[in-house]
């Protein structure tokens, strides 16, 4: 425990949206004069930002709260698990306070009650212009909205985070510019539903960076493309308006990367999920997009073992994967989530069947991925360096988002620094990662691409 300046620690779990919430809390605490630490021992109190989406995440959150109580004893809990009435208090009755996601004021109030705010004159220069970030200096998450209007039957996010509320586009662009000026090279735009950005405000036009900008995915992407840094739009729901950004990719204004979670490819399963179910239309769009943008990288996620899923329906999913030839794919076995409608739709798929289907799915996709990665050998690509150690540099290409996609290993990259852009030639590949060597003389460079991912 600290004896002088009041000190707060935080443990942030879950998705990038939760990371942004944690960063906002830390930024405000720093502005109020609190010292921040990642040590249980040094902290006067610890904030745990939880995830409550699936059972394993709930257990991880409860375990982390328990660890914080054991190591520190004064714990404030926030986040999605906090929105589930009584769950935390039942297991850990000694926590100081519990609040739901994005409950910034409640968390700050709890901190004030646990640790009196330091007496100081709150000068703005206590906090860096970009705020407190939990990510490396060269990339940052940018949250553009809160909540979701969809009611996918496997998901309980709307019950925890509410309906979609878009941030003003002028605020989003202003924050993005501050991040760029602080040295951020890559922005990862996050929300529950990026393609729906602005629907709640009827896509109204505001002035952002001195020019009229529509509050929409296209309007935001166009504005961010002027910043000269990489920008990835995550969680792009497969709306027709995704078509709008493809021509921008073809013109070289956006990076050719599209993250579009599809979840399944059998029409009846998609209907049960309350997801868009026109699989043929999806395949047509993918084909059309690749005709316009030949080097387009498409990332998606799928669920196997959804309640009632038959072998024939699973085979429809495999057939889709074979035909679509997606570049980046994540697969999850269906996990019952307390409060999810899907739990009561049909008989659950046995665990051993879910595992067997998962294995077959991944075997097929790994072969597709391996073929696509092998095709990159001998090509020169631009990468962004994430870290450098005794074995060389680790970077990502335009096709790779941090943590969820592959990496580019550069054994001869000891002279590079995190945040550098560099041209490399690929000399080896496996199912997910590349190995490359720098080409030509290294010169730090700007980039004017935006990534939709």
UniProtKB/Swiss-Prot annotation:
Which cofactors go with this protein? [4Fe-4S] cluster
Task: Please give the Gene3D superfamilies that the UniProt record associates with this protein.
Answer: Methylthiotransferase, N-terminal domain, Nucleic acid-binding proteins, tm_1862 like domain
Keywords assigned: 4Fe-4S, Cytoplasm, Iron, Iron-sulfur, Metal-binding, S-adenosyl-L-methionine, Transferase
Ranges where the Radical SAM core domain occurs? 134-371
The entry marks the following residues as binding [4Fe-4S] cluster 2, namely 148, 152, 155
Q: Does the keyword Ion transport apply?
A: no
What's any GO biological process attached to this entry?
tRNA modification
A GO MF annotation of the entry reads: 4 iron, 4 sulfur cluster binding
GO cellular component term of the entry, any: cytosol
Q: Where in the cell is it found?
A: Cytoplasm
- Per UniProt, what is one Pfam family of this protein? Radical_SAM
Q: Which InterPro entries match?
A: Elp3/MiaA/NifB-like_rSAM, Methylthiotransferase, Methylthiotransferase_CS, Methylthiotransferase_N, Methylthiotransferase_N_sf, NA-bd_OB-fold, Ribosomal_uS12_MeSTrfase_RimO, rSAM
Q: How is the cofactor bound?
A: Binds 2 [4Fe-4S] clusters. One cluster is coordinated with 3 cysteines and an exchangeable S-adenosyl-L-methionine.
Q: Which of the seven top EC classes does this enzyme belong to?
A: transferase
Q: Which residue numbers delimit the MTTase N-terminal domain? A: 6-116
Role according to the record: Catalyzes the methylthiolation of an aspartic acid residue of ribosomal protein uS12.
Family classification: Belongs to the methylthiotransferase family. RimO subfamily.
* Name of this protein: Ribosomal protein uS12 methylthiotransferase RimO
Q: Which organism is it from?
A: Hydrogenovibrio crunogenus (strain DSM 25203 / XCL-2) (Thiomicrospira crunogena)
